[in-house]
A protein has these predicted regions:
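Outer-membrane beta-barrel proteins
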Residues: 17, 22-37, 84-93, 141-146, ...
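Residues that define the transmembrane beta-barrel architecture of outer-membrane proteins
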Residues: 76-83, 131-136, 185-189, 219-223, ...
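Transmembrane beta-barrel strands of outer-membrane/channel proteins
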Residues: 44-52, 101-105, 154-156, 205-209, ...
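Outer-membrane beta-barrel "beta-signal"
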Residues: 364-366, 401-419
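Repeated loop/turn-to-beta-strand initiation elements of outer-membrane beta-barrel proteins
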Residues: 93-97, 147-152, 200-205, 233-239, ...
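N-terminal periplasmic/intermembrane-space "pro-region" immediately following the signal or transit peptide
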Residues: 1-69, 413
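Surface-exposed coil loops of outer-membrane beta-barrel proteins
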Residues: 52, 57-75, 110-139, 143-229, ...
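Residues on the lipid-exposed face of transmembrane beta-strands in outer-membrane beta-barrel proteins
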Residues: 44, 76, 80-89, 137-142, ...
């Protein structure tokens, strides 16, 4: 009986198998190709902020102060940071030509100028006398059908270096860290070529006029590049670099300077190696690490001190990031970083300086594109590089305002994204 039952079952299964195999699969709906205008990316936002300097509180001094070694939150008090409009189109197989245009206005835009575009060789940070608007990016691009596709770009564009970017909504924190402010450039003018070798490796390389330079201030060029890796689905890594002479030809400021000065300037290279790692494999959690190392031969600030035989400058640092989305609206982010300015060239201290910084940010999406942030930041230095307010400023032996080893700020910012 058991053998008969088993035979019946086997016969039934064998008969059903062809029927199952012949069952037609549901056809997958083909993705509709994008139109020309659908390939465009629009981005625009407005940001305002107020930063309160807690250092020296209660010691007098009601005037608006400054936050040393900061960039977009350099000024204490209210700041109209940025109004930006961006339109970009990447090259594609169907539409192989692309372009990008980013125009900005506000206090942040004033600090992003390149030489030759609203900035001259004599202009220096914090750029109080320059225009409050900027042509941040303007480029054309094209896709050449070679292998997986060779992408070419020419014009002015944002740097490949760094984890943080100019656009505030695309950062985890409101303030920019020391690596963004002191270690790397913001934009370049020149040409780039990019090629994807595999689904996990891409390379970009090109020739540019230098750091934040659109007019070529020393008749020389720099070389920019990137190795980008995606070894895992949620893990990205990149090695970025820029190398070339960046010092200004003195004849750009004084025509009476001899030609030999330019040759001397062009012989001094500046280079930066930039490593960026990011992981988003844990639900609602973003982790990132940025490491920089830079060096410049015969750095002009150190050379001008007249106290060193070795006038080279070296700087390096790291920044670690963690952000957690508690809800669709609430996010908290922390940043911890260290920056070593071995010669005091990047900080302007003139001596070896170590900087530490801890930042905590609470972000809340108030309504549609309206987002508010509250941020506390503590900066610490082994040297007195931070200004401290006094009702009657003390003077040091060098005739400088008294300074402290730490800086504490609270920032409140509000931005609205239109797209």
């Amino acid at each position: 009986t058991r053998r008969l039952l088993a035979a019946v079952l086997l016969t039934a299964l064998a008969g059903a198998a062809p029927a199952l195999a012949q069952t037609p699969e549901a056809k997958k709906e083909e993705e509709k190709p994008k139109t020309y205008w659908e390939e465009h990316k629009l981005f625009a936002y407005i940001e305002n902020s107020a930063t309160f300097n807690l250092s020296g509180a209660g010691r007098g001094g009601a005037t608006r102060g400054t936050n040393e070694l900061r960039l977009y939150d350099f000024h204490e008090g209210y700041t109209f940071n940025m109004a930006e409009f961006s339109i970009k189109k990447d090259p594609s197989e169907k539409y192989p030509f692309g372009y990008g245009l980013v125009v900005t206005a506000g206090s942040d835009a004033q600090k992003n100028h390149s030489f030759g575009i609203f900035r001259d060789e004599e202009d220096a940070f914090p750029f109080r006398n320059t225009e409050w608007f900027d042509l941040q990016e303007a480029y054309v691009s094209g896709l050449i059908p070679v292998g997986s596709g060779l992408t070419l770009k020419a014009g002015k564009f944002a740097t490949l270096l760094g984890y943080e970017v100019i656009e505030s909504p695309n950062n985890l924190n409101f303030s920019r860290g020391y690596l963004f402010t002191l270690a790397i450039p913001l934009t370049h003018t020149g040409g780039l070529a990019s090629y994807t070798f595999t689904d996990w490796f891409n390379m970009t390389a090109g020739v540019v006029l230098g750091w934040d330079d659109a007019k070529n201030v020393n008749d020389s060029v720099s070389y920019l590049g990137q190795f980008a890796f995606t070894p895992l689905k949620d893990f990205t890594a990149s090695l970025n670099w820029v190398v070339g002479p960046e010092q200004i030809d003195a004849r750009r400021i004084d025509e009476n300077v001899s030609r030999d000065s330019r040759v001397y300037v062009n012989s001094h290279l500046r280079y930066v190696l930039d490593f960026v790692f990011a992981y988003t494999g844990f639900k609602n959690l973003t982790l990132a690490l940025n490491v920089d190392y830079g060096h410049e031969q015969s750095e002009p600030f150190v050379r001008g001190l007249g106290t060193r035989q070795d006038t080279d400058a070296t700087w390096w640092g790291w920044a670690a990031y963690a952000a957690y989305d508690w809800t669709d609206k609430l996010r908290t982010s922390v940043r911890q970083e260290f920056f070593r300015d071995a010669a005091g060239a990047r900080t302007g201290s003139g001596i070896g300086t170590d900087l530490w910084s801890s930042t905590a940010t609470i972000q809340y999406k108030i309504w549609k594109g309206l987002v508010g942030r509250v941020e506390y930041r503590h900066d610490q230095s082994d040297e007195r590089v931070f200004r401290v307010r006094y009702s009657t400023p003390d003077r040091t032996t060098q005739g400088l305002l008294a300074r402290g080893n730490s800086l504490d700020t609270i920032s409140v910012s509000l931005y609205y994204s239109f797209f």
